[in-house]
């Protein structure tokens, strides 16, 4: 089956499939990639996608959806410079792992250590510290200078006293990112000045009502549904899987956080860095007043659908931020 431009029956702008559709073996599209060719679940119905370039003048326009390539992803990575010290390369602080999931501490710390970072500072529970040091001997334990945080990976919901203490520690950290409800600009300035923060797994239910955009949340469909339900939305995991873009946008709207919705196609929703910038990414285009940026990545191998992959992702994000 060959689809012309897009498969029949899919939501062109949002990738949703709400009725009968015809899955394609090959989709031939024209001018630029349409959002549904990049967004699930419609993206799974496209087969092999071929773009016929009509040389449209798209420079200077903000794409509604951008597909990550190796080249434009590499442009965001800061390479070490000759005079860099460990502090100039960055210090990532991690509060991860638990008695039940000690491996999450190791995976998140090792991932951060291998992602171009100057120092790992680990502040998880005692049960995890020895195995973290065994796996990452350069890790530093305890409080100190931190330039980006990772919290929540492998942290269960209060199963032991150590878990309770760890959740209290994370909750105290998160209070510094809470935007005020009384429009006090001084309080908000403090939150915006905090370092980047990755909130994963067991810390998602501790997220304040509203946070600045340097807070990155990394839920899968079930975790995003729980976060939205706690904020009054009527949604479950299957709803998120059926309309992932809609619910990722809704989570960003409600919380202010940058939302990284994990899946076979990962969707990232956040504030655009510069709405006037040029982009070499190919994608569907929106008007110039768009206030969100949507980036998708679907190039990962299926073997990443395994326990621990989210812990590795969180550690890498903390190092990159």
Kindly give the residue locations of the regions a language model identified:
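Small-residue (G/A/S/T)-rich helix-start motifs and N-terminal tracts that mark the onset
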Residues: 24-26, 35-216, 221, 225-321
């Amino acid at each position: 089956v060959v689809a012309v431009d897009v498969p029949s029956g899919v939501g062109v702008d949002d990738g949703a499939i709400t009725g009968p559709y015809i899955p394609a073996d090959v989709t031939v599209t024209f001018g630029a990639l349409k959002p549904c060719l990049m967004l699930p679940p419609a993206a799974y119905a496209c087969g092999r996608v071929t773009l016929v370039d009509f040389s449209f003048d798209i420079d200077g326009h903000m794409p509604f959806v951008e597909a990550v390539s190796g080249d434009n992803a590499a442009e965001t990575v800061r390479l070490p410079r000759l005079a860099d010290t460990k502090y100039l390369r960055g210090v990532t602080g991690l509060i991860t792992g638990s008695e039940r999931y000690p491996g999450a501490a190791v995976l998140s710390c090792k991932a951060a250590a291998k992602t171009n970072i100057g120092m790992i500072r680990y502040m998880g529970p005692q049960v995890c510290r020895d195995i973290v040091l065994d796996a990452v001997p350069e890790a530093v334990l305890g409080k100190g200078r931190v330039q980006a945080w990772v919290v929540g990976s492998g942290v269960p919901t209060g199963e032991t006293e150590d878990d309770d203490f760890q959740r209290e520690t994370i909750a105290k950290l998160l209070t510094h990112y809470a935007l005020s409800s009384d429009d006090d600009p001084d309080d908000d300035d403090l939150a915006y000045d905090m370092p980047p923060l990755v909130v994963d797994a067991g810390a998602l239910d501790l997220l304040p009502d509203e946070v600045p955009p340097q807070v990155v949340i990394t839920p899968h469909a079930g975790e995003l549904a729980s976060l939205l339900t706690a904020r009054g939305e009527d949604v479950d995991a299957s709803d998120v899987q059926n309309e992932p873009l809609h619910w990722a946008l809704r989570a960003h709207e409600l919380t202010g956080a940058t939302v990284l919705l994990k899946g076979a196609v990962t969707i990232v929703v956040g504030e655009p860095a510069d709405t006037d910038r040029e982009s070499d990414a190919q994608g569907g285009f929106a008007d110039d007043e768009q206030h969100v940026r949507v980036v998708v990545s679907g190039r990962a191998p299926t073997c990443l659908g395994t326990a621990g992959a989210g812990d590795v992702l969180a550690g890498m994000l903390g190092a990159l931020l």
